[in-house]
Amino acid sequence: MTYLTRILETKAREVAELKKLKPERRYREACGDLPATRDFRSAITSRDGGINLIAEVKKASPSRGVLVEDFRPLDIAARYAELGASAFSVLTDSHYFQGSPDYLKAITQQFSIPVLRKEFIIDESQIYETRLMGADAALLIVAALEPSQLRDYLQLFAELGLHALVEVHDRRELDIAIEQGSTIVGVNNRDLRDFTVDLMTSVNLKREYPEGVLSVAESGLKRRDDVLLMQDAGFDAVLIGEGLLASEELRQFSWG
């Protein structure tokens, strides 16, 4: 069983319990009168050849376990903001990443920077939940969805004022993302089947992006040269988490 399959099975059980506690109709009703979201797309759009930082607030991962023992999400986010982050990515999955919706809510209330919810979304109820949390954008993983699901979810995102970062790992998934109307596409250098990382995944796929689609490189970016590789390839932004905490080079990088 792959990492992704295991995670999605767990998520399906979580969503079933969630919908028992609060039917989707109640989520829809609660989203009827909310303040406008912040513009995630504009925040991460490259200008003058620079590259933007989506800084990830993450406590743990399935492959490496706990990354930050004394985990203080607001302190980490403040550090990222000082570094010049254009947006935050916040893990809300509790089972595999030790994340929490509470972390996301606290960060959205404390900072004016747009916030991406990093989650394994497989049901519409999670999209309404995302909006109610105060997120401005969320992740949609092509490998976790049917193409028709992706299309429907993108439409719901737009109706709720959310932006979607649509994640792909190969050319087939990129084609699906584009065909279904994605306007922000991230390439995950980590293969979610076995969690191996290859930075050339992003470089090679960037050549296939159509004009007008924003590009984000995700995972495995640990050094200044890694970011420069993505900048030279033409990416609008990179999504980095643990690398920022570990690398002085990345902390001193000139973002934007």
Curated annotation (Swiss-Prot):
Would you identify the family this protein belongs to, as annotated? Answer: Belongs to the TrpC family.
| Record keywords, A-Z | Amino-acid biosynthesis, Aromatic amino acid biosynthesis, Decarboxylase, Lyase, Tryptophan biosynthesis
PANTHER family reported for this sequence: INDOLE-3-GLYCEROL-PHOSPHATE SYNTHASE, TRYPTOPHAN BIOSYNTHESIS PROTEIN
Keyword match NAD: no
> Which Pfam family, any one, appears in the UniProt record?
IGPS
Cited CDD domains: IGPS (cd00331)
Q: In which pathway does it act?
A: Amino-acid biosynthesis; L-tryptophan biosynthesis; L-tryptophan from chorismate: step 4/5
Can you tell me where the transmembrane regions are?
Answer: none
Q: Name one GO molecular function term.
A: phosphoribosylanthranilate isomerase activity
> Which reaction does this enzyme catalyse, per its entry?
1-(2-carboxyphenylamino)-1-deoxy-D-ribulose 5-phosphate + H(+) = (1S,2R)-1-C-(indol-3-yl)glycerol 3-phosphate + CO2 + H2O
Put simply, this protein is called: Indole-3-glycerol phosphate synthase
Question: What NCBIfam families does this protein's entry cite?
Answer: PRK00278.2-4
- Name a biological process GO annotation: L-tryptophan biosynthetic process
Could you tell me which InterPro entries the record lists for this protein?
Aldolase_TIM, Indole-3-glycerol_P_synth, Indole-3-glycerol_P_synth_dom, Indole-3-GlycerolPSynthase_CS, RibuloseP-bd_barrel
Instruction: Write the Enzyme Commission number(s) for this entry.
Output: 4.1.1.48
